[in-house]
């Protein structure tokens, strides 16, 4: 079973002078469109030959799969046009919606002379989504029901195998799993956001407390020139997930999200702000601390969605691929930051809005407190990165790029949101579809990002040259269009070469004014960067992907870059330590050398 998202990590009590470490990993089972979460206790391993150096002890399969969350206390809530409802069953039928739903709400319609049972939505579909009974046997009974020789219901429903835990979670593909403040959260392509809470005793004792369905999210295929799914919503897509022959080929909730634990008015809150990914054109805001209240619908603060009718929230959103952010603004409020995303694969289309939307998490009306439109932006705004310049806990600046190849700085230093501004710090020609990383040097910031896209089939198959950039920013300077000679555009060019599966960088130094605006690394044909880099001290770890086998496979490399000049790592650079016995890694860093005596700065992985 493949793991398609990185594990969650958290620390427990201190024992023998060291904090206990734990993780939660996801295994996904494509044949049943389901996932399982496994909880691990991570142990340190000492290296007697290298005092003070620790690594993680190996985990056996039984160690990895020894503990799972429990699912017996699940509550499910759904947002529809007339509000948020808890899906409660009386007998085996949903109750308490007070006439606010019908078959049409969930895309159950008549076809020709066939008229499905008018109560299918509450007798079959919603009970299927909440997994209320001990098994799915009742749906086998529903599948056999007939009325005058015709099926009673619009489709046959999928029966999930409880012994294989297929009923607990849908397939988790692009969404992360994150642990903060005693909560564990993820989202899945069953159309739900899943919230777990820690219990007493074992630090791995988590139980599913709430599943949230942002049912009003609008959908339409991004990579499709037809009107497929036009005017459809996530609520109407639930029946597709439940259909008997379904195998996971649709998106539910698969965007990134962020958790933030804060104290307001003497009370703890754990805010969650998440994007829909390709599951819809919008985002959702939750307060996880409300899961144990008498009213679980209070967990949902607000949803924001693309609004063609210029309604209350008045925003234009594409598919919100990537990760939104949460930060404290200069007016003292905790706010959620959402990029406008991508409405269509055609970059120059006016359907793509390029803007940054900001929402007050302490006021749940879902109306943005700021809409920062990007003049001349194209292709939609990608995920932002927030910066606290003086480390006082307040956000001063945000950076984000667009698919036309520009990188922008958003000035958020005013207490008044209507005074927030945006300007480009870099103009290129290649699409930027991931958030930048920031490295702080003595007198300036380095904004580090890569170019490339895998949003559409054409993107995946493209072999267009892409780049990694490090742009110097001191809050005032701006660069023009880059000249790839390494001098004309003020960027120092480092060269990337490959020997077998190992990548090598040059370490050219700045001279004659070259590199006064930053640095650039040109990638090989087909390579691209679609993931935010990770910065540790002065090292940027950049994930490079290249698709193969007609887009069905990929080679993935992790490249370590010196953030000061874009060159190879120095002896003092941060780098991963991987055990010699790890044969899954082609080459790794530090002490290893090639046959020609070259020091390997960091290795590559292929999956």
Model regions: which residues?
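A fold-level detector for beta-propeller and closely related beta-sheet-rich head/sensor domains
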Residues: 1-607
């Amino acid at each position: 079973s493949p793991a398609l998202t990185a594990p969650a990590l958290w620390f427990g009590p201190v024992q023998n002078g060291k904090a206990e470490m734990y993780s939660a990993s996801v295994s996904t089972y494509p044949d049943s469109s389901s996932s399982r979460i496994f909880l691990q206790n991570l142990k340190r391993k000492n290296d007697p030959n290298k005092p003070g150096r620790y690594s993680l002890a190996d985990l056996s399969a039984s160690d990895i799969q020894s503990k799972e969350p429990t699912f017996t206390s699940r509550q499910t809530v759904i947002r529809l046009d007339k509000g948020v409802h808890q899906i409660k069953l009386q007998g085996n039928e949903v109750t308490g919606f007070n006439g606010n739903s019908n078959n049409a709400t969930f895309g159950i319609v008549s076809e020709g002379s066939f008229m499905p049972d008018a109560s299918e939505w509450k007798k079959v579909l919603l009970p299927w989504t909440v997994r209320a009974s001990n098994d799915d046997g009742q749906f086998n009974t529903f599948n056999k029901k007939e009325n005058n020789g015709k099926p009673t219901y619009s489709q046959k429903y999928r029966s999930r195998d409880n012994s294989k835990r297929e009923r607990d979670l849908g397939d988790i593909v692009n969404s992360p799993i994150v642990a903060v403040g005693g909560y564990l959260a993820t989202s899945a392509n069953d159309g739900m956001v899943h919230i777990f809470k820690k219990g007493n005793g074992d630090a791995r004792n988590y139980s599913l407390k709430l599943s949230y369905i942002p049912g009003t999210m609008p959908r339409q295929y991004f990579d499709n020139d037809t009107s497929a799914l036009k005017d459809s919503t996530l609520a109407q897509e639930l029946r597709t997930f439940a259909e008997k022959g379904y195998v996971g080929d649709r998106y539910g909730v698969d965007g990134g999200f962020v958790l933030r634990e804060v104290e307001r008015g003497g009370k703890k809150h754990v805010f969650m702000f998440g994007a829909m990914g390709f599951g819809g054109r919008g985002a959702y805001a939750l307060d996880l601390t409300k899961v144990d209240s008498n009213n679980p619908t209070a967990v949902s603060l607000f949803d924001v969605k693309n609004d063609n009718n210029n309604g209350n929230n008045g925003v234009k959103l594409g598919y919100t691929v990537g990760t939104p952010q949460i930060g404290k603004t200069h007016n003292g409020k905790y706010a959620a930051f959402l990029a406008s995303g991508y409405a269509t694969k055609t970059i120059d289309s006016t359907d793509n809005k390029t803007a940054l939307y900001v929402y007050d998490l302490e006021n749940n009306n879902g109306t943005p407190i700021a809409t920062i439109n990007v003049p001349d932006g194209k292709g939609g705004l990608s995920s932002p990165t927030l910066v606290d310049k003086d480390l006082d806990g307040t956000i001063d600046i945000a950076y984000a790029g667009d698919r036309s190849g520009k990188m922008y700085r958003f000035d958020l230093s005013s207490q008044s949101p209507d005074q927030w501004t945006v300007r480009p710090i870099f103009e290129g020609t290649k699409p930027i579809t991931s958030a930048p990383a920031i490295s702080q040097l003595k007198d300036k910031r380095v904004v580090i990002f890569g170019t490339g896209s895998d949003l559409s089939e054409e993107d995946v198959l493209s072999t267009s040259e892409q780049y990694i950039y490090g742009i110097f920013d001191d809050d005032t300077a701006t660069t023009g269009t880059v000249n790839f000679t390494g001098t004309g555009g003020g960027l120092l060019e480092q060269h990337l070469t490959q020997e077998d599966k190992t990548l090598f960088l040059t370490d050219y130094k700045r001279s004659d004014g070259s590199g006064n605006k930053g640095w650039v690394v040109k990638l090989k044909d087909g390579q691209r960067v679609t993931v935010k880099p990770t910065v540790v001290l002065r090292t940027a770890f950049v994930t490079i992907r290249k698709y193969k086998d007609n887009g069905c496979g990929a080679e993935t490399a992790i490249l370590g870059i010196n953030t000061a000049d874009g060159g190879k790592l120095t002896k003092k650079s941060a780098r991963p330590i991987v055990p010699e016995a790890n044969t899954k890694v082609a080459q790794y860093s530090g002490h290893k050398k090639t046959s020609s005596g070259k020091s390997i700065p960091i290795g590559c992985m292929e999956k």
